[in-house]
Amino acid sequence: IGSLSLYRRCVKKILPGEGSLRRLRIEISNTIDVSEGALAPRALLVGVGGTARAALKLARHYYKMSDDCRSMTAEQLDGLCAFLCGGKKEASDLILRLEAERIHTLIPGMLILQHVFRLFKAQQLVVSKYGVREGYLCQRILKNNTDTPKTGS
């Protein structure tokens, strides 16, 4: 499930209204269809990707957290989601100020994140500084460096 495809299927305007939020939540539940108790609880989740980093950036600002903070709690995520989904101008202003390029996908992505939190009964999200692409690239570079023959001096 991706936040952009979810946005395209469920949201009619730039930011989701009540009807769109309902459609988003139903679509997320239907797509990530896991029966209650099927997953072992995990207190800690690790977020790798742009949505997780953007959510953390907004949480830092909204909750006045330090710039070097790399995590947020379930309560903070729920509070931030409630604020962003509340339909107030301050919410869209915050997104536009901090993550304008994610204006369409941030709320759908955060609702996915919130759903995953609930499935695992997670208490905290730690957000990686780097995404999957960076990790793959580093792995390829490091692997190539170890395969390179060394010249003697």
Positions of PLM-derived features:
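Helical "lid/coupling" subdomains associated with nucleotide-phosphate turnover
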Residues: 1-153
